[in-house]
Amino acid sequence: MTDPRLTKWADTLASYCLDLQPNEQVLIRADEAAIPLARAAYRSALERGAHPHVQVIVDGLDELFLMHASDDQLDWVSPSRRLEYESIDALCAIIAPTNTASLAGVNPARQARAQKANSRMRQGLFERAGGGGAKWALTLYPTPGAAQNAGLSLALYEEFVLGAMFLDRDDPAQAWRDFSQAQQRYVDYLDGVELLRFVAKDTDISMRVGGRKWINSDGHRNFPSGEVFTGPHEDSVQGHVRYTFPTAHLGHEADDVHLWFEGGKVVRAEAARGQEFLEAMLDTDQGARTLGEVAIGNNYGVQRFTRNTLYDEKIGGTFHLALGNAYPETLAVNKSSLHWDMVCDMRPNAGGGAIYADGALIHENGQWVI
């Protein structure tokens, strides 16, 4: 990518997403292929008076660790990394997958074990962020592997990525502020709702959300963003949902996932492909069969499925439900080392769908009607 585009991206991360202030400690944690953006982000952080530190994740280390680590090593958490997560003011995570199938041959149970060991450290950062004590932003640098997954050339994928983040506009930060203001109207409405019901193809699922806090996800954490979300009451989810798109997690993919809920728990789960992995993730821990998040995608600049959740869950006209860990700022309490988002399309070309709030129609065939 050319320098001007990287500079605009990095400046938006520093000024809008993280709102870096003088003397704040910021960790820039980047995959190896994302070094150009990490370098630009480092400069932007310096220009704002922050204290940046860069960590580069070498390609292939995760696969080596999960294939060869002993059980003790899978359970071990680096004290230095834990201290870093406890002390930083901001985290900028830049994902750049060169091989999106690099973990496909890894035993899912080993992945779940390693993820569980590190979940407390991540949960601590989320709790600090929910209380205003820390900031984080996650973004995805385009690679040939990600472009191939999306069915696009690298050049077209780069344009897609830039458009999803509003980086093709003169003032991306102002565009996100305008978007945030428009999206806040939905948050204000949903904060007064007790019961939500989602109806779509092979889907009819209800949950209580009264007393929970809806979040306006407007690019300050996930970048790009464009969703409103909360955590449902843990024991309230009833019904079934059939997800439109294949869903990837930890390098594995499950296709045509259909889940049935009773009393807030998944009691039956089917996948046309990836059944073993789906069952392994559901058995990760006690909270893995409970929903930690319900969200509605509002970024109509994202129109196509790309096999990357960061973009797919934001598609305007979709909703997604996440199994496992809840975000503390929503006032939801489910805890799990798993957080797995799965997306259901409600647009007309997918068969349509509707969302009801306390019995009133609020969203139809991919569009808000309030």
Task: Indicate where each model-derived feature is located.
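Active-site bordering "gate/hinge" segments
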Residues: 1-239
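Short, glycine-/Ser/Thr-/acidic-enriched flexible segments
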Residues: 33-34, 97-99, 143, 203, ...
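Short, solvent-exposed amphipathic alpha-helical segments in soluble enzyme
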Residues: 42-47, 109, 213-214, 257-260, ...
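Short aromatic-centered micro-motifs
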Residues: 198, 260, 355
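Long, well-ordered mid-to-C-terminal structural blocks that present hydrophobic/aromatic surfaces
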Residues: 232-280
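A structural signal for short secondary-structure junctions
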Residues: 234-235, 250-253, 260, 285-289, ...
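Dual-mode signal for accessory low-complexity, basic/Gly-rich regions
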Residues: 268-332
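Internal helix-turn-beta structural module
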Residues: 306-363, 368-369
